């Protein structure tokens, strides 16, 4: 598929996660055996059934109301998107996918992300999200 199609799939996916908070909207952008992995915490899943539960029960409900995501660089090809972004969030909710076992600290966290998305048949096949967990832990006083 085209780079333009891949970008549209990615934008629809993150809109489902962060704007409309619609699990099915995000899943519609993915192949049946898609995988998602937040690498520092090994949180995510494989296959739409597992990802549906992950997004519904863990990821989407834990996104704080005060979450800002700013894309700083993006490379889009026919097979892959690599995105660099900055996130700023107010840690007011339990976020097992981001800070496992850490109750809300009410602190602001700034984190740089690298997201790698691979596509197959015009849909997202893999999504890997990387960040510096030590930098996050320092900001909340855990390191």
Q: What does each model-found stretch correspond to?
A:
Residues 1-143:
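C-terminal and inter-domain tail/linker signature
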């Amino acid at each position: 598929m085209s780079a333009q199609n891949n970008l549209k799939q990615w934008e629809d996916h993150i809109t489902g996660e962060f704007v409309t908070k619609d699990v099915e909207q995000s899943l519609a952008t993915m192949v049946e055996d898609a995988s998602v992995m937040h690498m520092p915490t090994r949180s995510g899943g494989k296959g739409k059934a597992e990802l549906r539960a992950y997004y519904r029960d863990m990821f989407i409900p834990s996104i704080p109301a005060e979450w800002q995501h700013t894309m700083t660089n993006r490379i889009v090809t026919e097979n892959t998107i690599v995105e660099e972004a900055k996130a700023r969030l107010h840690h007011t909710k339990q976020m097992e996918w981001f800070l496992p076992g850490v109750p809300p600290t009410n602190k602001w966290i700034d984190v740089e992300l690298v997201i790698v998305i691979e596509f197959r048949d015009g849909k997202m096949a893999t999504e890997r999200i990387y960040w510096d967990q030590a930098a996050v832990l320092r900001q909340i006083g855990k390191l």
